[in-house]
């Protein structure tokens, strides 16, 4: 299957690399910046472009991984002339029906994880949630996701919205607390590394205990 990526950010970079390693053919990468487009394209042996009108019309699957606002704004331009291919986005918070009226075949491929370009992740353990407007494409997306991960689920847009919100609490807000802790420690000349055993144990606990049962310290009170 030939795949084109619209976007070359943190998620797109990790997903494209994972698909490439599993033998999928990435034919092109689009990003508005040459550095991002070319960097990812070279890694997965693909062409690249920084112009939406130059995005290939020959791919069988288009994976859109852009910031939410940019995706909504650029959607008509992105799909122009390529309406008969399968289109998916990777966002947790955007409903599947955003595609409706723009393309015939569409869906969502949502790997629920925190991604950074500079850090490789083990896709085998990442939960992947799929959705499509046809049963045939649901199965196709499940097959693609299953090539990467042992944990593949079908989830509706409403379910995925809740997953995304839960992930924000679990990851983004938690990491922001680390930022605040690091700033406090720095102010008093203490290393953030002193927090790492505490961070690790806190994370390990919820593998064995319900989050409420694992809560200790001032937060209990």
Task: Give the label of every model feature segment.
Residues 1-49:
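NAD(P)+-binding Rossmann beta1-loop-alpha1 motif at the extreme N-terminus of oxidoreductases
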Residues 24-25, 104, 150, 190:
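Short phosphate-binding/catalytic loops that engage adenosine nucleotides
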């Amino acid at each position: 299957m030939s795949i084109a990526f619209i976007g070359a950010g943190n998620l797109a970079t990790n997903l494209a690399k994972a698909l490439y390693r599993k033998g999928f053919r990435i034919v092109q990468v689009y990003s508005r910046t040459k550095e991002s487009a070319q960097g990812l394209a070279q890694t997965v042996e693909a062409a690249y472009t920084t112009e939406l009108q130059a995005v290939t019309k020959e791919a069988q699957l288009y994976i859109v991984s852009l910031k939410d606002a940019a995706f909504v704004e650029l959607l008509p331009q992105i799909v122009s002339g390529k309406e008969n291919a399968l289109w998916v986005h990777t966002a947790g918070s955007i409903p599947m029906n955003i595609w409706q009226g723009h393309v015939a075949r569409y869906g969502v491929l949502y790997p629920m994880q925190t991604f950074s370009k500079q850090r490789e992740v083990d896709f085998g353990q990442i939960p992947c949630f799929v959705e499509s407007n046809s049963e045939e494409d649901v199965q196709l997306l499940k097959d693609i996701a299953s090539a990467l991960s042992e944990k593949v689920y079908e989830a509706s847009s409403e379910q995925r919205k809740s997953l995304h919100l839960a992930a924000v609490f679990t990851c983004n807000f938690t990491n922001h607390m680390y930022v605040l802790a690091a700033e406090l420690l720095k102010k008093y000349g203490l290393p953030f590394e002193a927090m790492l055993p505490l961070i690790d144990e806190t994370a390990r606990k919820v593998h064995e205990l319900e989050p409420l049962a694992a809560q200790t310290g001032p937060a209990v009170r």
